[in-house]
Amino acid sequence: MKETGGSIVNLSSVAGIIGDASSLAYCASKGAVRLLTKSAALHCARARYGIRVNSVHPSFAETPMVLDGIARARDPERLRAGLERASPMGRMGKAEEVANTILFLASDESSFTTGAEFMVDGGLTAQ
């Protein structure tokens, strides 16, 4: 990749940005992805490798991991409603919305983007 350039897109989470008292290890690991991304972006840019490194930080999206967690809850409808209320847009994200952000970052359309954090969170971190 050093010779040809390219794009690395790391998948993190808003939990690496805002934290959650009930998910300490998860938040720490996602925060580490955030800083790994920034450090790798600087390294690759300064070395002139032509490699862009960015991160995507989704909030609750309708993915197998999230949907399974909702299904296992004591009151799935209540949990889902709470997650939807937490989003300024009033809904959970869709896996395709996260995927489209990743596709953009992997494409040449983002050729001057490196070290960036993309929140796909319906405005959650804007609050």
Regions found by a protein language model. Give the residues of each.
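Residue(s) in the substrate-gating loop at a strand-loop-helix junction
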Residues: 13
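Active-site loop immediately N-terminal to the catalytic Tyr-X3-Lys motif
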Residues: 18-24, 90, 108
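Hydrophobic structural elements of the Rossmann-like NAD(P)H-binding subdomain
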Residues: 9, 53-56, 66, 115, ...
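Alpha-helical segment proximal to the catalytic Tyr-Lys
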Residues: 42-46, 111
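Short C-terminal tail/terminal secondary-structure segment
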Residues: 18, 63, 102-103, 110, ...
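Active-site helix of classical SDR
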Residues: 29, 37
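A glycine/serine/threonine-rich, flexible loop-to-helix segment
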Residues: 60-86
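A conserved structural motif in NAD(P)-dependent oxidoreductases
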Residues: 87-98, 109
